[in-house]
Amino acid sequence: MTTQSRIKNEMKNMIENHSDEFFAYPSENDYLNWHFTIKGPKNTEFEGGIYHGILNLNNNYPSNQPTIQFFTPNGRFAVNTALCLYTLSNKGWQTNWTLINLLEALINYMPIQESHTGSITESKEKRLEYAKNSSQFKCEKCGLATEHIKGNVNF
């Protein structure tokens, strides 16, 4: 299966298997760049937060894992920095993983304190503040404003 046909299947899968915890969509100009929005994991200091970022796929996807960047401050991951997560690295990445699997893993990984490229450690209070303020975020790249999706019944 080519990268392009795999990505088309991913788009269909994302629509058919709607989640209340996240959504993602390809950029209008580049099907290899997917903007994502996730809810902070429940029962953590991220709960109530809405976090936006980008998954950069490549021409070898799914053989190579996408890179992940957050745009919304969250106190766990640096913004505008490619993350290198060991559990999501090529050692753990498998070609049968979908973008849905990746986003679910990312949500589950948020509260885990491990040091890696792109990680930061802010206090619980600061993370709670980021979660509260995340509703004011607007993506400069795609124009998505989290205030418009916070009450959306589909998310």
Where does each model-flagged region fall?
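A general secondary-structure signal for short beta-strands and their flanking turns/coil
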Residues: 31-33, 48-50
